[in-house]
Amino acid sequence: MRQFSMLSVLLLVLLIASPLAGAADIPEVLRISAIPDENPNELLRIYAPFAEYLTRELKMKVRFTPVVDYAATVEGLAAKKLDMVWYGGFTSVQAVRRTNGTAKRLVLRQEDAEFKSVFIAKPGSGIRVLGDLKGKTFAFGSVSSTSGHLMPRFFILKAKLHPDKDFKQVAYSGAHDATALWVESGRVDAGALNFLVWEKLVETKKVDLSKVNVFWTTPPYADYVWTVRGDLDKGLQERITSAFLKLDYQNPEGKRLLDLHRTKKYIKANDEDWKGIEEAAVAADLLR
């Protein structure tokens, strides 16, 4: 009997020591991605340097994996084909739901704690307030975009307008920069997009302000956030978080990366901050 007990203890010790028992999930290659809210070349320009930085900081291979649409980032994280994604607020809510509450938000830009959408129209269109959109053609970005669809739709509904009933036509451009170009070209009368993308388009002279400008800006809300799959090794999650938090705008490399993401600082995420996004999605009938 004593021999059997000793054998049981030995087997238990071996099982606990086995790399298969409660093994931390540390992938050979950390696969990062981002919602495709801008054109593919721009996304590669932004995120490839982040992959290089994380490779050095984490001392492991990190690869940026582009995707074709917003849904692919959600499904990719759920299927463990992606390890970390730069989500918009709405897609982060979808990812948390799709992974049964396990996806974990890590860090966001300080601007994302109080993000905004801008509504744009052609000067001389007669559109000055949300109520003027009635009977007009309008462009959102992607269906799954927080700043390009969900929150603009939410504030339109609060203004007692229903886009699908009160607008002449609703279209989806698929990306923030595309929305701006659609309005500028006259393809649609008005549209809504991410305020940081709008500022970048203005600064880089990608839009002509004599042909398109902002007529309304939303109140602030929580938006973009780096999110990992929940079963990723906790120590690795902490190292990823530290790598972003240590980026210093006074340091040349830190400034280069932070400028790519149009921020000066990352801050830790608090899951409670996205409850409002989830409630807005339910109110807009985009989540059940």
Language model: regions and residue ranges:
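Pocket-lining segment of extracytoplasmic ligand-binding domains
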Residues: 125, 136-235
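An extracytoplasmic/periplasmic, membrane-proximal ligand-sensing/linker region
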Residues: 27-34, 38-49, 221-223, 227-288
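Hydrophobic/proline-rich hinge and linker segments of small-molecule sensing/allosteric domains
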Residues: 106-129, 226-229
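Bacterial N-terminal signal peptides
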Residues: 8-18
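Sec/Tat signal peptide C-region and signal peptidase I cleavage site
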Residues: 19-23
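Bacterial N-terminal signal peptides that target proteins for export
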Residues: 1-9
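Short helices/loops that flank or line small-molecule/ion binding pockets
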Residues: 71-85, 98-99, 131, 175-196
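Extracytoplasmic small-molecule ligand-binding "clamshell" domains
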Residues: 25-91
